[in-house]
Amino acid sequence: KPGRGTAEAKGDHGKIDVLTGTLGKAIGGAAGGYISGKKDLISYMRQKARTYIFSNSLPAPIVYGASAAFDLLMKDKSLVKKLHKNTAYFRKEIVKLGFTILEGDHPIVPVMLGEAAVAQDMSKELLKAGVYIKGLWFPVVPKGEARLRAQISAALSRKDINRALKAFEKVGKKMNVI
């Protein structure tokens, strides 16, 4: 997979009128997002889309950082390969530890915990162990489907991932999750 999103993965680039993307995860992890499409459509959206009209421009450092990240991804194909390798490794190892994850190969790995209180507590305990990970619960996800959202990156070394996995194991056992 080249890592250029769903449209490319599905071979749908020529069939899509509006392409949206986030800058809050893969590209720099800062904030914001983008839409792209034909000039007339984008011009219309700038005049009519309330979310655009009543919002602020992204700060210049975020735009510059995202642009630099896109340039880097275009030049260095090894980053996408490393991301896929890191993702596959984390997914395989977290399941070996006894955690349940949603299937897939996406670098955002939902570690399913069920109850909101468990996700909240585990997120706090992992932070104490040096791993920052967001918990999600109702109303963000359906009731009973609370989870931790692990975001795997090409910037992580195998040592980083193993350290996170050890923290998951320690906290998971302490909380009787695994």
Task: State where each predicted segment sits.
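Membrane-embedded alpha-helical bundles of multi-pass transporters/translocases
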Residues: R4-T6, A129, I133
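Hydrophobic side chains in well-ordered alpha-helices
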Residues: Y44-M45, M122, A164
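Beta-hairpin "wing" of winged helix-turn-helix
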Residues: G135-W137
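Active-site C-terminal subdomain of aminotransferase-like
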Residues: K1-D105, A117
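Conserved PLP-binding catalytic core of the aspartate aminotransferase-like
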Residues: K81-F90, V95-G130, V140, G144-E145, ...
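PLP-dependent enzyme catalytic core of the Aspartate aminotransferase-like
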Residues: K128-V131, V140-I178
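Alpha-helix N-cap and loop-to-helix initiation/capping positions
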Residues: G11, G114, L156-K159
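Short, solvent-exposed amphipathic alpha-helical segments in soluble enzyme
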Residues: S36-K38, T51, E125-K128, A167
